[in-house]
Amino acid sequence: MKAFLLTLLAQLCSASLVPEREKDPEYWRQQAQETLRDALRLQHLNQNVAKNLILFLGDGMGVSTVTAARILKGQLQHRKGEESLLEMDKFPYVALAKTYNTNAQVPDSAGTATAYLCGVKANEGTVGVSAGVTRDRCNTTKGQEVTSILRWAKDEGKAVGIVTTTRVTHATPSAAYAHSANRDWYSDGEMPLDALEGGCKDIARQLVDNIPDIEVILGGGRKYMFPKNTSDVEYPQEERHRGTRLDGKDLVQAWHDTKPAGKVAKYVWHRRELLALNVSRVDFLLGLFEPGDMVYELDRNNETDPSLSEMVAVAIRMLQKNPRGFFLLVEGGRIDHGHHEGKAKQALHEAVELDRAVGLAGRLTSPRDTLSVVTADHSHVFTFGGYTPRGNPIFGLAPMQSDVDRKPFTSILYGNGPGYKIVGGERENVSAVDFAHANYQAQAAVPLRQETHGGEDVAVFARGPMAHLLHGVDEQNYIPHAMAYAACIGPNRAHCSSAARPAATATLLPVLLLLLLLC
């Protein structure tokens, strides 16, 4: 009822919907001229070699989520919201990526991760392997492994890191280092007997074994690293948080053991430990802050769990020590989970936090030598509409009732999901519930226990060296190829001996013409 009254109050104040400055046509003309000047500056392309690469991945962050997050960001700053700018909005180059998997029109996060990290499209449910691998079929994996841009960067001597709000063994991060016929094989405790007997490794073990010199790994997923029934350090009484491994291995200790003599490897599980870290004295960092996924930003314990922004800040400072540069994968992974649960408020606050991390990374690096890319793996069947007035609370009601059942509805809705609610044979009256609550499940048209992904294209925002290569409508697997070209790594090293030629030629041309005239 409180939420209903607040929305009603906002709509009653609609007489002042238009800010005074926006009533003056000159305001819009000046704004357009500033945008035009910015666009004209793009004629001078940044063709530097990218020393550093940062890929920000908003899991499930479709265009409707980006727009709603922009409005939320503005409203959190006590503005109307629509006129706000996300940090990613400030990136000068924008493209669209087609997200389908090789066997799925509407994709999952594993096949898409293989595309934007490894540069090849793949089947849904598989990570780090080609489309020749069938989900769950361990015996189809051998010889079908594909490597990621993280591996390409490491092979060129760069530092590399992974930061996520999900498990570090989840679909997005795992495609950076693992090769698996099933994205859900987090530990050997989740694997079927035939896969174990077939010699396939679980994803947590691959994290330790495949690329042992990853400098930074931060996220959740402690329980997949410890033997079955090992009590969790933070939740010792909770059985669901205990270790899951059947092989008896302590993979945190194994992670320590793989590090070269003389190098300092640090494992942390508490925010205080992370923020107190002296990065100049640490060579390798593993931080696992929850047994499974990290807690939603709105519910986060500020004592024990770091925010995504805090993890990114530590990661960049760690990786910047390498004079050859770095590659960093940053995933705002729980945007996706919020949408699956129909909890739009959780999802959008996760998106705002990812954008906060984008801004922080921008302040810690320079676009002169750092290529930053922000994108999503897929969208969701999330929408907002209803002819809402300017400044309407993003989690509020539309200003109209249904002309069919005569009941109000929230601006935010889902095409399907757990928010399908029938009360007394009719659609639930949302004015009787707290629709502004963090865990409110927005109404959905079709009942499902979990809301589904959407199949439309996703945005790709780019800034820095060679960012102009990301333009138009591209296949999703193009992204790492463009980034690798910018950094002279992986399959795109060949051009690097002449990387400076376009700029050099442009600089020397006037001199050459002058010499010809003098002769």
From Swiss-Prot:
Zn(2+) 2 binds at D336, H340, H453. The keyword Phosphoprotein applies. InterPro entries: Alkaline_phosphatase, Alkaline_phosphatase_AS, Alkaline_phosphatase_core_sf. GO terms for cellular component: extracellular membrane-bounded organelle; mitochondrial intermembrane space; plasma membrane; side of membrane. Residues 499-519 form a propeptide. It is found in: Cell membrane; Extracellular vesicle membrane. Its EC number is 3.1.3.1. Mg(2+) binds at D59, T172, E331. Its cofactor is Mg(2+); Zn(2+); Ca(2+). SUPFAM superfamilies: Alkaline phosphatase-like (SSF53649). Keywords: Biomineralization, Calcium, Cell membrane, Disulfide bond, Glycoprotein, GPI-anchor, Hydrolase, Lipoprotein, Magnesium, Membrane, Metal-binding, Phosphoprotein, Signal, Zinc. One of its GO terms (molecular function) is ATP hydrolysis activity. The active site is at S109. It catalyses: a phosphate monoester + H2O = an alcohol + phosphate; diphosphate + H2O = 2 phosphate + H(+); pyridoxal 5'-phosphate + H2O = pyridoxal + phosphate; phosphoethanolamine + H2O = ethanolamine + phosphate. Disulfide bonds join C138-C200, C488-C496. A lipid is attached at S498 (GPI-anchor amidated serine). Its main location: membrane. CDD domains: ALP. Binds 1 Mg(2+) ion. The keyword Magnesium applies. Alkaline phosphatase that metabolizes various phosphate compounds and plays a key role in skeletal mineralization and adaptive thermogenesis. Has broad substrate specificity and can hydrolyze a considerable variety of compounds: however, only a few substrates, such as diphosphate (inorganic pyrophosphate; PPi) and pyridoxal 5'-phosphate (PLP) are natural substrates. Calcium-binding is structural and does not influence the alkaline phosphatase activity. At very high concentrations, calcium can however substitute for zinc at zinc-binding sites, leading to strongly reduced enzyme activity. This is Alkaline phosphatase, tissue-nonspecific isozyme. It comes from Gallus gallus (Chicken). The lineage of its organism: Eukaryota, Metazoa, Chordata, Craniata, Vertebrata.
